[in-house]
Amino acid sequence: MGSNKPLGKKVRLAKALKQNRRVPLFVIVKTRGRVRFHPKMRYWRRKKLKA
């Protein structure tokens, strides 16, 4: 993808990047390991964004 992007697309890509993080360690500890992963994790090669 080129480096020149419209602002709207850039904002959507940034949001998707922020959402694609693992569950924080303090949450895993707080829930005693019940919450280990979140199902909306996206791997860049498998699932493509509609951005």
Swiss-Prot record:
Keywords associated with the record: Ribonucleoprotein, Ribosomal protein
Highest rank taxon of the organism: Archaea
GO biological process terms held by the UniProt record: translation
Signal peptide segment: none
Gene Ontology molecular function: structural constituent of ribosome
Gene Ontology CC entries for this record: cytosolic large ribosomal subunit
UniProt similarity note: Belongs to the eukaryotic ribosomal protein eL39 family.
Protein name per UniProt: Large ribosomal subunit protein eL39
Species the sequence originates in: Methanocaldococcus jannaschii (strain ATCC 43067 / DSM 2661 / JAL-1 / JCM 10045 / NBRC 100440)
